[in-house]
UniProtKB/Swiss-Prot annotation:
GO cellular component, one term: membrane
Protein name: UDP-3-O-acyl-N-acetylglucosamine deacetylase
Organism for this UniProt entry: Haemophilus influenzae (strain PittEE)
Underlying gene: lpxC
Main enzyme class: hydrolase
GO process annotations (BP): lipid A biosynthetic process
Binding positions (Zn(2+)): 79, 238, 242
Catalytic reaction list: a UDP-3-O-[(3R)-3-hydroxyacyl]-N-acetyl-alpha-D-glucosamine + H2O = a UDP-3-O-[(3R)-3-hydroxyacyl]-alpha-D-glucosamine + acetate
Essential cofactor(s): Zn(2+)
HAMAP family: LpxC (MF_00388)
Keyword Lipid metabolism in annotation: yes
Keywords: Hydrolase, Lipid A biosynthesis, Lipid biosynthesis, Lipid metabolism, Metal-binding, Zinc
Record family assignment: Belongs to the LpxC family.
Length: 305
């Protein structure tokens, strides 16, 4: 049987909030089978819980934010969510003493190290997957994202920025998902932004924690980071990272073929909602026999950094 996974022990880290610029303490705790992914704002009294749910994603400007019925939010969850998807963690309690998850270095890599340091253990309950059964597509102008059936999790993402530093040869990335592929090919890709946009946003009191330490920054002509890029196509790899995190907002790893053109947090969420709203388009599956599970989902906890 392919089993659910959680952490072996709790672990804590301190970082900076991307939007507030303030110190944030993040604590990750084990959870019982069938708990799912649950975020908690511990700075509020009483503590407010945000179960991962695509219908709770009510703001996708600049990041993915969960907002409850009372208007309370927790922001910038997508990179941590991507790390959970990458390692196949089904059940976890995530506590944060601020309105946002710390940005760390702008990628999912610090969260991967944190989760592996805590340790991952299997639980005595069958792991559920969402299997795509029918073609589903959403569009927004010239942007689009789609799912179709596939026995695995395949991703194909294309960006299109008119910028001298983003050539046509680095605008597309394709990957057959596995824990190893995610850790080595995707998790280290950092978020990015354009200097003119960052200056405007900071003048509006936003992205106050943004810096060259946690983002790739481009001016009109070049990349400003002294150390350059981690991959020549790091920007499109990061957009794939975002998509993996956004699609894991359902709380289950997906079996299907995902393809997107110029998609972002909003369209990723719209696609996930469209899939789940159509009962004919998907189904829950479990695997009693490890021989039957798609190759990319075999033993995702066994990752070599």
């Amino acid at each position: 049987m392919i089993k659910q996974r959680t952490l072996k022990q709790s672990i804590k880290v301190t970082g900076v909030g991307l939007h507030s610029g303030e110190k944030v303490t993040l604590t990750l705790r084990p959870a019982m089978p069938n708990t799912g992914v649950v975020y908690y704002r511990t700075d509020l009294n009483p503590t407010v819980a945000f179960p991962a749910d695509p219908n709770s994603v009510r703001d996708t400007m600049l990041c993915t934010a969960l907002i409850n019925e009372q208007g309370v939010r927790i922001s910038t969850v997508e990179h941590l969510n991507a790390a959970l998807a990458g390692l196949g963690i089904d059940n976890i309690i995530i506590e944060v003493d601020a309105p946002e998850i710390p940005i760390m270095d702008g990628s999912a890599s610090p969260f991967i190290y944190l989760l592996l340091d805590a340790g991952i253990e299997e639980q005595n309950a069958a792991k559920k997957f969402i299997r795509i059964k029918e073609y589903v597509r959403v569009e927004d102008g010239d942007k689009w994202a789609e799912f179709k059936p596939y026995n695995g999790f395949r991703l194909d993402f294309t960006i299109d920025f008119d910028h001298p530093a983003i050539g046509k040869d680095v605008r597309n990335y394709e990957m057959n998902f596995s824990a190893q592929a995610f850790v080595h090919q995707i998790s280290r890709a950092r978020t990015f932004g354009f200097m003119k946009d960052i200056e405007y946003l900071q003048s509006q009191g936003l992205v106050l924690g943004g810096s060259l330490d946690n983002a790739i920054v481009l001016d009109d002509y070049r990349i400003l980071n002294e150390d350059g890029l981690r991959f020549k196509d790091e920007l499109v790899r990061h957009k794939m990272l975002d998509a993996i995190g956004d699609l894991y907002m359902a709380g289950y790893n997906i079996i299907g073929d995902f393809k997107a053109y110029k998609s972002g947090h909003g369209l990723n969420n719209k696609l996930l909602r469209a899939v789940l709203a159509n009962q004919e388009a998907w189904e829950f599956v479990t695997f009693e026999d490890k021989e039957q599970v798609p190759q990319g989902y075999v033993a995702p906890a066994q990752v070599l950094i």
